[in-house]
């Protein structure tokens, strides 16, 4: 310490203190900027990962339901083939056999592409998959169960494509 000039010592201390040393101030500023940039990079990476996951999910959904329009348009064909089989009776004939084979092949292709048939006779009425067109009093079936199907319903990969039109048993 300089006893002749005590003010010099305090001046030296002030110049070298971390609050006033320009290099230390700049280093702290740069450290703050680096931390901010690192946080930005992490946010951008997370956003990019979220976009990638959304894109994968969207592509998967598009693949899963790409045939929805086509299969939906084939439902009346299934209905017609089914009605034709019912009308032809149970007597074997080449025409009936051909119709049945065509129906089974077409249905297999549709099922392989995610279609599921809803033929709920005897099942409990499910408003998510069935549309009740009437109720009938019956003694041998529990109330709330489907007793007749007017039109079969269909699901595509667990999504309702068309509800089954049904008659439901009601209480006496």
UniProtKB/Swiss-Prot annotation:
Location in or out of the cell: Cytoplasm
Region span, Disordered: 1-23
Gene name of the encoded protein: grpE
Oligomer status and interactors: Homodimer.
GO biological process, one term: protein folding
Functional note: Participates actively in the response to hyperosmotic and heat shock by preventing the aggregation of stress-denatured proteins, in association with DnaK and GrpE. It is the nucleotide exchange factor for DnaK and may function as a thermosensor. Unfolded proteins bind initially to DnaJ; upon interaction with the DnaJ-bound protein, DnaK hydrolyzes its bound ATP, resulting in the formation of a stable complex. GrpE releases ADP from DnaK; ATP binding to DnaK triggers the release of the substrate protein, thus completing the reaction cycle.
Keyword annotations from UniProtKB, A to Z: Chaperone, Cytoplasm, Stress response
Molecular function GO terms recorded: adenyl-nucleotide exchange factor activity; protein homodimerization activity; protein-folding chaperone binding; unfolded protein binding
Gene Ontology CC: cytosol
InterPro entries named in the record: GrpE (IPR000740), GrpE_coiled_coil (IPR013805), GrpE_head (IPR009012)
PROSITE patterns linked: GRPE
Family: Belongs to the GrpE family.
Organism in which the protein naturally occurs: Xylella fastidiosa (strain Temecula1 / ATCC 700964)
Name of the protein described by the UniProt record: Protein GrpE
């Amino acid at each position: 310490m300089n006893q002749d000039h005590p003010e010099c010592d305090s001046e030296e201390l002030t110049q070298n203190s971390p609050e006033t040393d320009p290099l230390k101030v700049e280093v702290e500023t740069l450290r703050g900027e680096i931390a901010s940039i690192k946080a930005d990079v992490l946010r951008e990476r997370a956003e990019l990962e979220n976009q990638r996951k959304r894109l994968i999910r969207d592509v998967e959904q598009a693949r899963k339901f790409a045939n929805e329009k086509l299969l939906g348009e084939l439902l009346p064909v299934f209905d017609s083939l089914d009605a034709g089989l019912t009308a032809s009776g149970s007597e074997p004939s080449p025409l009936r056999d051909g119709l049945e084979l065509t129906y089974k092949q077409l249905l297999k292709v549709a099922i392989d592409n995610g279609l599921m048939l809803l033929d709920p006779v005897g099942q409990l009425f499910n408003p998510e998959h069935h549309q009740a067109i009437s109720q009938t009093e019956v003694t041998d079936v529990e109330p709330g169960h489907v007793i007749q199907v007017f039109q079969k319903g269909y699901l595509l990969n667990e999504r309702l494509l068309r509800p089954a039109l049904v008659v439901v048993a009601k209480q006496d």
